[in-house]
């Protein structure tokens, strides 16, 4: 069997038809064998051609004399340019000299083939690496990445010269594939009829890879199962299912070669696999996930009555490890202060995203897919942020401060000018939403470069979800009722929010004291936070669920921060929005003492207005102090 049939490539006659289709699509400028960027109709080429520093004007496909190969090459670049995958800069600048080397190699090495698919990809890549090395061209490049330990480390990768040929061969093999996308060993989500809610556009995960299975039968079984699961689950989760089942069945093939079908499985193999997992040193939650995926497969085989099903129950409840109650991975204020002091060193859009997520605590996918027009304003001038929750598959609305509103408005103006066709607040150059990895990468790069450290002096590693944990933990610890936090974060159940109801040892005593203290209004009335009628009060709801509640020198203002600065300077004691607690008692006693002194002077001098004002202040303070000490 030749290499082409192994890869399920269509017949030569069908390839000839495909070549004809390629030529039909490449009309006008694209039919030329030399592409001049100054004549290219692609919008990105028109813009790039105006750059006086542009050195590489031509892509000369005529260097390849083999007409079949030349057509495949031209179509490879034509397709990527006209389907939004690449822009002109990618072809004429990034791949400029790279293309010429590849064209010369193909013309030299394969002058007589009728398709690049006649050459096994491994053979072609080996020959090309040898060719480049003899030409004095580097076949690897060194990139640097920030590791999970916040260390900068070099990473070797194939150079553009090597990857360009690999991309070309894989593209043509895919184009000539004899079958549906489901028949391939690598499923590309862009070629599958998946609804939008199955695909998170903020992730780089484009494929589900079934290569690497040691047993072909089990590979086909897993492919069928994954196709079924795509009806219920997200693309990224099904990709994880495929990888975890590959690990299990490869384990079987290595340790229990005699097991060739699912119905041959016994507890012996399962227990050996569980032991293997436990010896890997992975977290209990990770082990639970792998067992759950395996049990899900076995359960589905039984329920849907597939031909090959387990002969007995293989997974028991006691197989699942006990998972410790997860503590919220909040970001310490010590770290946040450092981060915020260096926001100016981040790209403008990343800094804006950081401010939004610190206040609203949304998930990273929700942050990246914020859309233009996400601000809502009510009749009182208060602003709210509207965004889509990918996990819950629903729209969510939260109150937002005027400071962040201003940042969003500035960003909207900028994006509308630079990316008028994109609906997103933080788009990539192609108009799609920013990828999660870009946000995380920029924050951790900043932490490394600016030496943002934790209290132990270690460079801090930012995880996007930790901002959500920080908002949840901070609000719970500040006494906000759990059901309010649940609504603010958009949790479906109280259990999802309860993980934030954790006060850490360092602040346990102080937080408990704060929780127990009384809140008193300007009239000395006690606010009972557990009273249902008080909880339903609109102003107190705002006070509780506003993350950035306004703290005064002698108490709190129940007006939400979103309302802006108070126009009534030094009038808190006469304001119905004012409330205070026992921790401010010394300030009230000191103010009462000063007020009594001023009142004595006013009476001596018979300053009637000052007597009235200070008498009212004295009365308010006495009511407050009496309630706090009573």
Swiss-Prot record:
Q: Which UniProt keywords apply?
A: DNA integration, DNA recombination, DNA-binding, Transposable element
Q: Which domain of life is it from?
A: Bacteria
The protein's matches in SUPFAM superfamilies, at most eight in alphabetical order, are given as: DNA breaking-rejoining enzymes
Name all Core-binding (CB) domain ranges.
Answer: 216-302
The record places the active site at 363, 391, 465, 468, 491, 500 (o-(3'-phospho-dna)-tyrosine intermediate)
Native source organism of the sequence: Staphylococcus aureus
Carries keyword Electron transport?
no
Q: Which PANTHER family match?
A: PHAGE INTEGRASE-RELATED
Q: Please name one Pfam family that this protein belongs to.
A: Phage_integrase
GO MF annotations, alphabetized:
DNA binding
Tyr recombinase domain residues are: 326-513
**Keyword Hydrolase listed:** no
Q: Which GO terms describe its biological process?
A: DNA integration; DNA recombination
UniProt name for this protein:
Transposase B from transposon PsiTn554
Give me the gene this protein comes from.
tnpB
Spell out the family assignment given in the record's similarity comment.
Answer: Belongs to the 'phage' integrase family.
